[in-house]
Amino acid sequence: MAADLLDVHGLLFKRQQYKEADLLAKLWTKELGIVTVIAKGGMRPKSQLAAAVLPFTEGTFSILTRYKGISQLRTYKKLSQHDELFTDLDKNAYLSYLFDLADHAFSEYQKLGGYYDLLLVAFNRIVAGQDPEIIAQIVQLQLLDAFGVAPQLGACVICGKEKGIFDYSIAAGGVVCSDHFRSVSRLHLSPKATALIRTLALLPISRLGEIQIGEDLKKESRRAIAQIYQATVDLHLPSLRFLNEVRGS
């Protein structure tokens, strides 16, 4: 199969040295999904590709691709970089984890659909200074569908009731209303935490405004999401361990 020279727009979210002077990098792209590219000579100080392979560089990348395996980064046309991410440990930790999580939800060259914008909006919101914990929880909850384990959050799993007091049941695969609290095992969340999880899972991230959520409530919903992931996805990501160290949890 002949290789095509193609322009893709997206974000470089991961890189590692390959051999002596080359780099392997992962791109989150609108056109092709997740793509691993090799930047030949990218480690050399005078490399023309050096600027394009810095972590969290957004732009238009020209790649030589066969739509499988490793593509080759040839050049770039427009780049946007965020130098503050190199010194802001919190932002860096959150973003590294979110893209690592998304990287495990999709195969390479799999179309991302609306998840492309989900991660890009999350990236830009965190860079702009919005609460990274709330944004991370939105992404975590909405990526569950990409993993094939989307919970039912719009209504009670058992009776379909949409309003009232709810709790989350991992065994039932979603929320249960107070009428059925004794019917299934549940997480015993506060009503506010369950309401927050339902809201974050169903809210388009582009509609997220400036909101103030108490630290205790965020920690409760964070623990619940961690339990959901452990029971349904069961990933053990070093990036999550690092994030937990940074945020002290």
Swiss-Prot record:
Keywords per UniProt: DNA damage, DNA recombination, DNA repair
A single GO cellular-component term on record: bacterial nucleoid
InterPro entries: ARFGAP/RecO, DNA_rep/recomb_RecO_N, NA-bd_OB-fold, RecO, RecO_C
Keyword Ubl conjugation: no
GO biological process annotation, one example: double-strand break repair
UniProt-listed Pfam families: RecO_C (PF02565), RecO_N (PF11967)
Function recorded in the entry: Involved in DNA repair and RecF pathway recombination.
Family per similarity comment: Belongs to the RecO family.
NCBIfam families in alphabetical order: reco (TIGR00613)
Protein name, entry field: DNA repair protein RecO
Source organism per UniProt: Lactobacillus delbrueckii subsp. bulgaricus (strain ATCC BAA-365 / Lb-18)
